[in-house]
Amino acid sequence: MTALPARGEVWWCEMAEIGRRPVVVLSRDAAIPRLRRALVAPCTTTIRGLASEVVLEPGSDPIPRRSAVNLDSVESVSVAVLVNRLGRLADIRMRAICTALEVAVDCSR
């Protein structure tokens, strides 16, 4: 990784436990350089149709295959495992991700 990730970006993440997969950066930009960590949501090609998922499409989103952002599986990772930036999601897509995260952590009450 040469540059720090930013909120709303999609990066390839390489971890021994999960291998290589795209993730969406959820952390606020101010926290990333101080903590050297980022809260990320993994992308999966298994689309379950849950309210806690957001489907991304190649062509309109910076993702190689049709995938779902899984907001039930967010985790904090070292920026060192974020190895290649794929691009940035549109604001409308990030709003959908925030709504799905609210569902995943049951904060809508």
From Swiss-Prot:
Molecular function (Gene Ontology), one example: DNA binding
Gene3D superfamilies listed in its UniProt record: 2.30.30.110
UniProt superkingdom: Bacteria
UniProtKB keywords: Endonuclease, Hydrolase, Nuclease, Toxin-antitoxin system
A Pfam family that the UniProt record links to this protein: PemK_toxin
SUPFAM superfamilies, sorted: Cell growth inhibitor/plasmid maintenance toxic component
Enzyme class: hydrolase
InterPro entries linked to this entry: PemK-like (IPR003477), Plasmid_toxin/cell-grow_inhib (IPR011067)
Signal peptide coordinates: none
EC annotation from Swiss-Prot or TrEMBL: 3.1.-.-
Stated role: Toxic component of a type II toxin-antitoxin (TA) system. Upon expression in M.smegmatis inhibits colony formation. Its toxic effect is neutralized by coexpression with cognate antitoxin MazE5. Probably an endoribonuclease.
Similarity section: Belongs to the PemK/MazF family.
Assembly and binders: Forms a complex with cognate antitoxin MazE5.
PANTHER family in the record: ENDORIBONUCLEASE MAZF (PTHR33988:SF2), ENDORIBONUCLEASE MAZF-RELATED (PTHR33988)
Name of the protein in question: Probable endoribonuclease MazF5
Lineage: Bacteria, Bacillati, Actinomycetota, Actinomycetes, Mycobacteriales
Underlying gene: mazF5
